[in-house]
């Protein structure tokens, strides 16, 4: 599946995200944040055409934020609050976002690759043009989400909750969905392997005669 990729022009390298937020009079644009280690507090700001490389900003707050044309690479934003935020043309590569809150957010043209998003919460988010490749999303939450045009490959969804999220036309066949939480109406049109279909039937209380 093809999605729009981030369009980034970086002109400045900055060593503090918080200082940039504190002094911002308008959108934060064309910045590369590299090897930043700090706890950040941000609210209702927009980052455009920026790169975050090797940053460690755990237990931070980025509520109601806008991220457009952004790359996160080799970053750790675990236990950070990104709730009610907007992500458009964003890539997460080799990142750690364990226990991160993305509730009630919007994701358009977003790619997450080779990253750890265990225990992250995407519930009540609107998700489309979304690629997940080789990620660990075990014990994460996608409850009551709208998911459209989503491509998933070789990812781990052990005990992940998709309750009240329609999984129509989403292919999980080469991913691990052991113990996922779904309702009968959620799995209509979901694409799975033969073995996964048998496991899902057990979760849903369906007995198959052999």
Residue ranges: model-predicted function:
Residues 2-210:
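Tandem repeat scaffolds
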């Amino acid at each position: 599946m093809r999605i729009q990729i981030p369009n980034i022009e970086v002109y400045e390298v900055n060593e503090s995200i918080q200082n940039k937020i504190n002094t911002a009079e308008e959108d934060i644009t064309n910045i590369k944040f590299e090897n930043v280690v700090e706890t950040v507090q941000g609210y209702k700001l927009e980052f455009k055409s920026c790169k975050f490389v090797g940053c460690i900003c755990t237990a931070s707050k980025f509520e109601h934020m806008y991220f457009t044309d952004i790359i996160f690479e080799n970053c750790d934003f675990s236990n950070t609050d990104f709730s009610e935020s907007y992500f458009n043309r964003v890539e997460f590569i080799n990142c750690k976002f364990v226990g991160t809150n993305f509730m009630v957010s919007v994701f358009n043209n977003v790619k997450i690759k080779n990253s750890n998003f265990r225990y992250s919460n995407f519930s009540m988010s609107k998700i489309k043009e979304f690629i997940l490749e080789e990620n660990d999303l075990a014990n994460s939450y996608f409850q009551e989400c709208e998911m459209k045009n989503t491509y998933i490959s070789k990812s781990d969804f052990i005990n992940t909750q998709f309750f009240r999220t329609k999984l129509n036309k989403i292919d999980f066949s080469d991913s691990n969905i052991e113990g996922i939480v779904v309702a009968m109406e959620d799995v209509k049109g979901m694409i799975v392997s033969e073995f996964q279909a048998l496991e899902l039937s057990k979760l849903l209380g369906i007995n198959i005669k052999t």
